[in-house]
């Protein structure tokens, strides 16, 4: 099995329900994918049982399905959400404080950053909703110092299913597959209404409700990070560091933050005994069309994981292409050439990656808040120094 000390146990609670208690299946269980309504039902049960969790409606899809955002932090931080949001709004637009660095330092010292995680924008990449349910439970109930520090220094915000229309279609298709073992079944033609993989190329056009809902949430909360979860290559690729060409409107401070977070992720997960974790790769950092780039274009930090997945909850023997387990300077601990891979393995990697990222972020929260302010200030100054900033037609 592929596991880590962060996911090889589940903290007990007499009052707060686990996903298994509400849905009848542990996170990452074989042969089970929850519909959107079940995912949301779990998060609302979690919020009803814990003062450290709040659920917010953030809009609806083209077909009328609800999208949610779930905030998790210490009870005192959740009680002060509005005041914290007002402080972050001033850091997000330094004109409101006359570009005063001393005032910004005061706001940084008083504020708590927001780390926004999104899952299941690509409907055939099925693991993130269950991983995020269990992650939320851990963050809400675990008394371990590692988790308590995250909970007291970061507001974790989660949208467990971004493409809600496509998720339900995918679950229906997967359930047909379970009811007809051994029979071929087609991939989804469309996920949303009417869009498939390119729902993650909409951050410029903003033509989809899911894009507008996530953008409104990120900007409305004045979050510092937007971390989008995907599935493809083995075993976890933090593509945040990326490769050239770099978009000229990306602040060099952000490039440094990508490096900080990405390489720390690789180091920490390698120390925890998880092979196949790497960054850099060949993902370019040019196009602002990806959902995560809503953060990069609003002075935050865009992040994305690609975790190994099976396009469903089947447990499958996977033989890797030699290129996938080649040892390189950026992949010194490559994945195994052949594995029996389950959705639980996928969930262990996603949760471990997110927890190590949240841990690093919580330990450097003041730094990232100050960077958030500086990037915002520099974005105001850049048109005067480097222009043009826009074209009017």
Question: Model-flagged regions — what are they?
Answer:
Residues 1-393:
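Structured catalytic-domain cores with a bias toward divalent-metal coordination
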């Amino acid at each position: 099995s592929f596991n880590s000390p962060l996911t090889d146990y589940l903290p007990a609670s007499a009052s707060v329900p686990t996903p298994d208690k509400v849905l009848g299946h542990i996170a990452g269980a074989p042969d089970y994918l929850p519909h959107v309504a079940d995912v949301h039902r779990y998060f609302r049960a979690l919020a009803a049982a814990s003062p450290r969790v709040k659920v917010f409606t953030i809009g609806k899809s083209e077909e009328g399905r609800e999208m949610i955002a779930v905030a998790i932090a210490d009870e005192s931080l959740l009680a002060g959400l509005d005041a914290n949001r007002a402080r972050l709004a001033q850091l997000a637009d330094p004109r409101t404080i006359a570009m005063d660095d001393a005032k910004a330092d005061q706001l940084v010292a008083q504020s708590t950053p927001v780390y926004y995680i999104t899952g299941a924008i690509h409907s055939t990449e099925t693991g993130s909703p269950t991983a995020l349910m269990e992650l939320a439970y851990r963050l809400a109930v675990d008394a371990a110092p590692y988790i308590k520090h995250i909970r007291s220094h970061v507001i974790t915000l989660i949208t467990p299913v971004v493409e809600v229309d496509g998720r339900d279609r995918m679950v229906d298709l997967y359930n047909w597959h379970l009811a007809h073992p051994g029979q071929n079944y087609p991939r989804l033609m469309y996920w949303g209404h009417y869009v498939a993989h390119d729902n993650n190329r909409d951050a410029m056009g903003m033509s989809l409700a899911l894009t507008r809902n996530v953008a409104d949430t990120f900007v409305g909360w004045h979050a510092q990070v937007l971390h989008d979860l995907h599935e493809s290559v083995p075993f976890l690729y933090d593509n945040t560091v990326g490769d050239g060409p770099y978009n000229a409107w990306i602040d060099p401070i952000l490039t440094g933050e990508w490096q900080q977070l990405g390489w720390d992720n690789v180091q920490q997960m390698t120390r925890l005994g998880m092979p196949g974790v790497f960054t850099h790769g060949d993902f370019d950092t040019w196009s602002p069309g990806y959902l995560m780039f809503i953060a990069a274009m609003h002075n935050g930090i865009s992040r994305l994981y690609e975790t190994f997945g099976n396009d469903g909850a089947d447990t499958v023997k996977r033989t890797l292409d030699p290129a996938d387990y080649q040892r390189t300077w950026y992949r010194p601990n490559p994945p195994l050439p052949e594995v029996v891979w389950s959705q639980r393995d996928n969930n262990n990697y996603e949760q471990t990656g997110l927890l190590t990222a949240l841990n690093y972020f919580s330990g450097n929260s003041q730094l990232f808040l100050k960077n958030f302010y500086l990037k915002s200030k520099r974005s105001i100054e850049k048109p005067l120094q480097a222009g043009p900033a826009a074209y009017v037609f």
